[in-house]
Amino acid sequence: MRRFRQDQVIDGGASLADVVLVLTRHDYCFVRVLGEVVRVIERGDMQKPLVRMWLFGFVTSTEMLLRERTALRWPDESWTAQMSAGRLAKARALRDERRRRGQECQLLDCVQFADVAQILLDVPEEVLAFGFDSKATVKRAIKEFESLRNNLAHAQDIVTYDWAQIARMAQRMESYVDAA
């Protein structure tokens, strides 16, 4: 009988976030059902569609939250004063193109994620609300978040380049669930 380190073994009902946390510390995660290890999970398994959809769902939820908080903080598109003229022009052009195609949308829906994040996270209270301690941390997180988002969207490797971001997202998700 093979012995496993206790912190490598999770119960069958554990969350995907629990699996990610184990794989942050170990090469393998073992799943136990009825007292027996029945499954081995490795980091490479995190490339599979189910995990990628889970992560993309979290990415999408985060983007929606940032847009919602931006719209609440700056009603009537007053957030546009926070953007450069060039970036705002690109957002307007995208909105106009979407409308031409019959897709009704708000201007904020056409602003790039990094721009929305930068607008919102320039506000010290928002930085703290999202659990960051400095603007430098925010900028790094935005860059890593975008990398993960882009790699997910374009079916690129996420384990090699985005593992730290995946682990942080899993921890954050667990804290949200625990708080609820």
Could you tell me what each predicted segment is?
Residues M1-Q8, E42-D45:
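Bateman (tandem CBS) regulatory domains
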Residues G13-Y28, E36-A180:
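Amphipathic alpha-helical interface elements
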